[in-house]
Swiss-Prot record:
Keyword Endoplasmic reticulum assigned: yes
Listed PROSITE patterns: PH_DOMAIN (PS50003), ZF_FYVE (PS50178)
Annotated region (Disordered), positions in chain: 221-249
Keyword Zinc applies: yes
Positions bearing Phosphoserine: S16, S239, S248
Lineage, broadest ranks: Eukaryota, Metazoa, Chordata, Craniata, Vertebrata
Record SMART domains: FYVE (SM00064), PH (SM00233)
Species of origin: Mus musculus (Mouse)
GO cellular component term, pick one: endoplasmic reticulum
GO molecular function: zinc ion binding
All copies of domain PH, residue ranges: 35-131
Protein name: Pleckstrin homology domain-containing family F member 2
Role this protein plays: May play a role in early endosome fusion upstream of RAB5, hence regulating receptor trafficking and fluid-phase transport. Enhances cellular sensitivity to TNF-induced apoptosis.
Length: 249
């Protein structure tokens, strides 16, 4: 079906509409063989609060952006190659329901659908696209993924020393390896994580010690379904600001 749609006028028109919604700041999306599989609004768990984001699933990439005017204008376009994507379901917990993790070597995050059916459809379509891509390319799924950042609202004290309380002066930072919220003194070191940046990035002392000894796996994040506190803040429907988890800290 995907091959049949690839060169259809309807598919070309749909992709052109998506391009126009992102405007000149967005990347061109029309290439031979690319098919728009589906689209919809998902709640993305950002650093400070959950936010509505518009997602577009193509047969080779996943695109999302901030909603300025629904179905008319989006900005802050992000493009994720599907061949690098792994997804994992998240258990329902309180108000956080119908979620899954989108994991890549450069960035990982949680998203939530409005219904269980919508979640199932998204996950099934993403998995099929990834499987088809890997089958055609002969590549193997990536086993290295960036940490999913723990939302700021889940940590009132440093998650490493368990002592430092966060205040407007004592700021929160995120370890790029484990995703924990940590204080400045517990994250003064930097380490080169090539999949995330060409420059050394901030990591916590715990991960630094493990990485320095070559124990890369020991500091892999384990908190895949613990985001319950983040929905205590209301959903920000006006999503014309940057993703909070794109900040430097």
């Amino acid at each position: 079906m995907v091959d049949r749609l690839a060169n259809s006028e309807a598919n070309t028109r749909r992709i052109s509409i998506v391009e126009s919604c992102f405007g000149a700041a967005g990347q061109p999306l029309t290439i031979p063989g690319r098919v728009l599989i589906g689209e919809g609004v998902l709640t993305k768990l950002c650093r400070k609060k959950p936010k509505a984001r518009q997602f577009f699933l193509f047969n080779d990439i996943l695109v999302y952006g901030n909603i300025v005017i629904q179905k008319k204008k989006y900005n802050k376009q992000h493009i994720i190659p599907l061949e690098n994507v792994t997804i994992d379901s998240i258990k329902d917990e309180g108000e956080l329901r119908n979620g899954w993790l989108i994991k890549t070597p450069t960035k990982s995050f949680a998203v939530y659908a409005a219904t269980a059916t919508e979640k199932s459809e998204w996950m099934n379509h993403i998995n099929k696209c990834v499987t088809d891509l890997l089958s055609k390319s002969g590549k193997t799924p990536s086993n290295e993924h960036a940490a999913v950042w723990v939302p700021d609202s889940e940590a009132t004290v440093c998650m490493r020393c368990q002592k430092a309380k966060f205040t407007p002066v004592n700021r929160r930072h995120h370890c790029r390896k484990c995703g924990f919220v940590v204080c400045g003194p517990c994250s003064e070191k930097r380490f080169l994580l090539p999949s995330q940046s060409s420059k050394p990035v901030r990591i916590c002392d715990f991960c630094y010690d493990l990485l320095s000894t070559g124990d890369m796996a020991a500091c892999q994040p384990t908190r895949s379904d613990s985001y319950s506190q983040s929905l205590k803040s209301p959903l920000n429907d006006a999503s014309d600001d940057d993703d909070d988890d794109d900040s430097s800290d």
